[in-house]
A protein has these predicted regions:
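Periplasmic polypeptide-binding modules associated with outer-membrane biogenesis and secretion
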Residues: 1-142, 173-178, 184, 210
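Outer-membrane beta-barrel translocator/receptor signature
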Residues: 133-135, 144-197, 201-207, 217
Length: 299
């Protein structure tokens, strides 16, 4: 509100010259460059907050009721630092980083000038989500192979597993379906378990030196899936992947998985005579049902 921009396009060549000036009526306090003095961190601020505990870490002050977030987690995302000049880009990066933490619902930052000096205190207010979440999802499946049936997914989420905004998510899924062909009923069911653990930083940190402004995350996923065609075979699948995610802006996101492992197997004891005969008559199909162990990398 205190800056004007004048654009001059007379020069042509599809170019514009921009002249940025500060308005004459800008108050002195808005012209003054401020240096950050102290930083006050409220890790879970609520209107009903009564008693708090304040812990000093140099010029950082953690103000908390339950100490639900470790100081290192908050400091890692504070780009406004004591002794440095205030910059709006640091403010925007701080808000973006804090809002990306799974436990954080809302971020608010206030500034308090210190007396008549050019020093500024920064006050960070975080409001948290509920740490634990449970959900159930029900669906129905209709396949082109005439299989149909109900399915369900139960999810458990911990948004602050070790007080460092780590995300733990567990999915338990199941499905039952039948196939109707010429009056015959062919049943099948599927069960699966998937566990995902996510850190709001790179681990180990020395592998990728990208910086906290890119919202780094480390993810580890492992899962097991069982598919049982009761009249034909039983398919077991194990998979795991370890990788990193980061994004310098809201439009571009990078995902790099240096380790991806998939193992599938059909136990011989689960194969019916009818299924074995079908595989012998169709060698091309048989290869798709062979035991597979796949290791890869993706970006």
């Amino acid at each position: 509100e205190f800056i004007t921009v004048r654009a001059d396009s007379v020069s042509g060549n599809h170019e514009i010259k921009a002249l940025i000036t500060v308005k004459p009526d800008t108050p002195p306090e808005s012209r003054r460059p401020y240096t950050i003095r102290n930083i006050y961190l409220h890790d879970d601020h609520t209107l009903e907050q009564t008693t708090t505990d304040t812990i000093a870490y140099g010029k950082y002050y953690l103000i908390s009721q339950r100490r639900s977030l470790r100081f290192e987690t908050l400091q890692r995302g504070m780009f406004l630092k004591p002794g440095q000049r205030y910059a709006r880009t640091d403010y925007m990066h701080t808000v973006r980083y804090m809002n990306e933490l799974p436990i954080v619902r809302h971020t608010n930052i206030k500034f308090a000038p210190y007396g008549n000096t050019d020093s500024l205190d920064v006050i960070l207010y975080l409001s948290q989500r509920k740490r634990y979440a449970y959900s159930a999802e029900f669906n129905a499946i209709f396949r082109s192979t005439n299989y149909f049936g109900p399915g369900m997914i139960f999810s458990y989420t911990d948004r602050n597993k070790n007080k460092g905004a780590e995300l733990l998510k567990v999915n338990l899924r199941g499905r039952f379906e039948v196939q109707l062909v010429d009056g015959e009923v062919n049943p099948a069911y599927e069960m699966g378990l998937e566990v995902n653990y996510q850190l709001p930083r790179f681990y180990p940190s020395f592998l990728l030196n990208i910086g906290q402004r890119s919202l780094p995350k480390t993810s580890l996923t492992a899962g097991y899936n069982l598919f049982n065609r009761l009249d034909l075979y039983r398919l077991n699948s194990l998979y795991t992947n370890f990788g990193y995610r980061w994004s310098k802006n809201d439009r571009v996101q990078h995902t790099f998985n240096p380790i991806e492992v998939i193992f599938t197997q059909i136990p011989e004891a689960s194969k019916s005579d009818e299924f074995n005969q079908y595989l012998q008559e169709n060698p091309g199909v048989q290869r798709s049902f062979d035991e597979q162990f796949i290791v890869g990398t993706s970006y």
